[in-house]
UniProtKB/Swiss-Prot annotation:
Gene name for this UniProt entry: lpqB
Cellular component, GO annotation: plasma membrane
Protein name, UniProt field: Lipoprotein LpqB
Signal peptide location: 1-24
Record InterPro entries: GerMN, Lipoprotein_LpqB, Lipoprotein_LpqB_C
Keywords noted in UniProt: Cell membrane, Lipoprotein, Membrane, Palmitate, Signal
Sequence ranges of Low complexity compositional bias: 348-359
Pfam families documented for this protein: Germane, Gmad1
Keyword presence, Lipoprotein: yes
Length: 602
């Protein structure tokens, strides 16, 4: 609709002989942080994404041109009068968020019947910005199918075609979203209050004070998707607006009186939320927090606070640790070649035909993952690993690094995954083909006990080949395989009296097909993916935001087969030729010969 229709509008409005078409070929959103801008952008795709300024409705437009003009004007949030000039009812308000589209997929059907007309526009639908400002992608192949009804008989129409019926959401392409919205990050708290949980939000450029808008949102209900995971805010909900003033690199947040009633723990939690939200959103590098002009006390005795002040809440600030890998003999080792387990697993005994006992083959590991640890944490490291048995079944081991024990046996287990609370997750496959997602708490002194995890209907009958839990324990990334290939999904962890459920599933990077051991949480906000693109056999590494909005590509060796990532650590891959390579700057460096399946603590 932003091609022929836009050209016609510009001719009518400006009597111009030439205008630029904008029927661009968009892809899965990969843009960076949003900055204020006009309705124009540099085009790196041969002129396909050039934006044309929106114009007020004029006389003589066809129904198709009216709809095209309205959709273009919808992106000018700073001047809604332009979009409303195409409407029979200028009081219309969008109340259901934004459908983000790929403009290359549009098709238009329209019909006229007297003084009434309909225009149906079908676009490739890549995602939705919800009313709480959060974004989620749509499955590959989704369409946004919208019908607009137009009339010439409404009083406001004055005999011209104007839209009388339309959906209560905006339809914008990615470039329009980036020009119309700021992007910021809100930080909430995990169910136990130990860790910060981030979420990206889109704020209209009409919100002139972005810092205040971000802080106000922290005092409103938690976005629905995260709320179902038990995520909460320590800032009490209030109708009294905080004020934020920024001077140099310091943001001063003055909170209303209810915040003075927070207890000591809540003050620390609220301070961490405010500091991370404002600093990570680029508002300031230091934060000062007051209530009615008086400092809000905190346990750090900090007047101005930085990310370092509250790093204990950050699940990405981990004790330095290297990756583990599995050598050619099936022994798990540290990156320097030292054995991971001390002592190693004992050799099982087998009975000869004479009845005498003899050593059996030691179990061969196929994966081993150390639990992540926060800076300053004490106690022995925990580890979980999977061995392949002589009968081709597998056994899951877990426990402290010096005393792992067998926990479960089945046909197979996915590579284990840990959160920072000592919960280890895996997917168990039994000989009949049935599968169960399992989670168990591992401590240095108790035998792990696992419970079954439910999953909502979206993937209830799908084959899950990989599960990776976020270090804050609130989200999981799943690789699901079907007859058409593999797909990455993200879900939230819901805990209740009825048990643990994975819900709220949505696809991430739907155009790529990840490897089973090719997904890792690179940080609390991003996933690293080893995958092939649709229609290609070339393996590539992708760094994708957990909401699917941003993505960057990293070339990898042609025979890469597994991947691991961790905050502030270089990307590492295992290859089919049984080498482990790490990304050193822009080049891949072989660091292990005769090993594979590297895993950072995660």
């Amino acid at each position: 609709m932003r091609g022929t229709a836009v050209r016609t509008i510009l001719r009518a409005a400006c009597a111009a002989a030439v205008a630029v078409g904008v029927s661009g070929c968009m892809t899965v959103p990969t843009g960076g942080r949003v900055h204020a801008g006009s309705q124009a952008s540099q085009d790196s795709q041969g002129g396909r994404n050039i934006q044309v300024p929106a114009a007020y409705a004029v006389e003589g437009l066809s129904p198709k041109d009216v709809v095209g003009g309205f959709r273009l004007a919808s992106a000018v949030l700073s001047n809604p009068a332009i979009a409303r000039s195409y409407l029979a009812d200028p009081t219309w308000q969008p109340t259901e968020g934004v459908h983000v589209i790929d403009e290359s997929g549009e098709s238009v059907v329209y019909a006229i019947n007297g003084d009434t007309a309909t225009v149906r526009v079908i676009d490739k639908w890549v995602g939705t910005i919800f009313t709480d400002g959060t974004y989620q992608p749509q499955p590959n192949g989704a369409t946004s199918d919208v019908t607009y009804t137009l009339t010439k008989s409404a009083p406001q129409s004055k005999g011209e075609w104007r839209i009388s019926k339309l959906p209560n959401f905006l339809v914008l392409d990615r470039t329009e979203v980036e020009n119309a919205f700021w992007q910021g990050s809100l930080y909430y708290l995990s169910p136990g209050g130990q860790f910060l949980v981030p979420v990206r939000v889109f704020l209209p450029h009409t919100a002139t004070d972005v810092a205040t808008a971000l802080v106000e949102q922290l005092s409103q209900p938690v976005p629905g998707w995260l709320a179902h995971a038990g995520v909460f805010s320590a800032l009490p909900q209030t109708d009294q607006a905080p004020t934020v003033t920024v001077s140099g690199d310091v943001a001063t947040v003055d909170l209303p009186p209810p915040f003075g009633n927070l207890n000591a723990i809540e003050r620390d939690q609220a301070s961490a939320q405010l500091t991370y939200t404002l600093v990570r959103s680029g508002v300031a590098s230091q934060v000062r927090i007051t209530v009615g002009g008086a400092p809000l006390p905190n346990s750090r005795q900090a007047v101005t606070q930085t990310l370092k002040t509250w790093s204990a809440f950050d699940p990405d600030v981990l004790r330095t640790a290297t990756f583990t890998y599995i050598d050619d003999a099936g022994v798990p080792r540290l990156a320097n070649g030292a054995p991971l387990l001390s002592p190693p697993l004992p050799e099982p005994t087998a009975t000869k035909g004479t009845g005498t006992a003899a050593p059996g083959p030691r179990p061969r590991f196929v994966s081993a993952v150390v639990a992540p640890r926060l800076v300053g944490s004490s106690g022995p490291d925990l580890v979980a690993g999977v061995t392949r048995n002589p009968d081709n079944t597998q056994t899951l081991y877990a426990g402290p690094i010096n005393a792992v024990v067998p926990v479960l046996s089945a046909a197979s287990f996915s590579t284990p995954s840990w959160d920072l609370l000592g919960n280890v997750w895996t997917v168990e496959q039994v000989s009949t083909g049935a599968q169960e997602i399992l989670v168990g708490v591992v401590t240095p002194t108790t035998t792990p006990k696992f419970q079954r995890v439910n999953i909502d209907g979206t993937l209830a009958s799908s084959l899950i080949v990989s599960l990776k839990v976020s270090r804050d324990g609130t989200r999981v990334a799943l690789v699901v395989r079907s007859t058409t290939g593999s797909q990455l999904w993200v879900g939230r962890v819901e805990r209740s009296d009825r048990g643990v459920t994975i819900g709220g599933l949505y696809p991430v990077a739907p155009n790529v097909q990840p490897a089973a051991d090719g997904v890792a949480w690179a940080s609390a906000t991003s996933l690293a993916i080893l995958a092939t693109s649709s229609g290609s056999e070339i393996v590539t590494a992708w760094l994708v935001d957990v909401d699917g909005w941003d993505a960057t590509i990293q070339q990898v060796p042609f025979d890469a087969s597994s991947l691991t990532a961790a905050p502030n650590q270089p990307l590492a891959i295992g290859t089919k030729s049984r080498q482990v390579e790490v990304l050193n700057g822009s080049a891949w460096q072989v660091v292990v010969d005769g090993g594979t399946v590297p895993n950072y603590p995660s």
